Amino acid sequence: MIKLLLTDLDGTLTEDRGTYVVDIGAIKALRRAEKAGIRVALVSGNSYPVLRGLHNYLGLSGGLVAENGCFVFHGGVTFRVCETVPREVVSEFAKTFNLRESWQNEFRRSDFGFTPAELKDEMIKWAEERGLVVQSSGYALHLSGKPGGKGAGVRKLLELANVKREETGAIGDSRTDIEMFREAGITAAVSNADPELKRVASISLKLKSGAGVMEFIDMLLS
């Protein structure tokens, strides 16, 4: 019995990859899951304010993991999981590799976004030399304080929610969701997901993005 459903945001709850437009059918499916007793949690590289607002307005009860695992919200309390990245280091990274900072960086503390999203070996070396983590979601580069990655945040959320791995479902589209999938008992990759994610998923869905969310929730509720 699945008690908690973890869902990514961009490319998963949206109408497609590469758009910010949320799929209305997917949102209705999340509400059906909640009404059936499955708590829904948002797990994303997005900033805490964005996810907290969505969590509230969509009527979700499972909490959230923001900034790629660096912040967790559950039961009205927010927890920091990752180390803080100094603002001057963020600016140095952008300048060194000629990157554009995300508009959300103003509201971030431990995980910062940049475009273009292409990850290069010299970026990884630069981050490692400073005790940081850098990864690409396919939408943006993310520079994070350690431990970085969705896995640490999801583990904290499951602990707070008192939910076991086998009682947890997860759905996503990006290689950055692999860590989240490792913490869930049943996992689903939408049809337009990264190949790396499909290889580790329990289920490869027939439908893309938001339509895939509807497909997966139908499976869970059947």
Curated annotation (Swiss-Prot):
Q: Where does Mg(2+) bind?
A: D8, D10, D173, D177
- Top-level enzyme category: hydrolase
E.C. code: 3.1.3.18
An annotated GO cellular component: cytosol
The reply to whether Magnesium figures as a keyword in the UniProt entry is yes
Required co-factors:
Mg(2+)
Positions that bind substrate: K150
Enzyme active site: D8 (nucleophile)
Q: Which reaction does it catalyse?
A: 2-phosphoglycolate + H2O = glycolate + phosphate
List the keywords (alphabetical): Carbohydrate metabolism, Hydrolase, Magnesium, Metal-binding
Q: What would be an example GO MF term here?
A: phosphoglycolate phosphatase activity
Q: Which domain of life is it from?
A: Archaea
Function (record text): Catalyzes the dephosphorylation of 2-phosphoglycolate.
Q: Which PANTHER family match?
A: HAD SUPERFAMILY HYDROLASE-LIKE, TYPE 3, PHOSPHOSERINE PHOSPHATASE
Q: Which family does it belong to?
A: Belongs to the archaeal SPP-like hydrolase family.
Q: What protein name does the entry list?
A: Phosphoglycolate phosphatase
Q: To which species is this protein native?
A: Metallosphaera sedula (strain ATCC 51363 / DSM 5348 / JCM 9185 / NBRC 15509 / TH2)
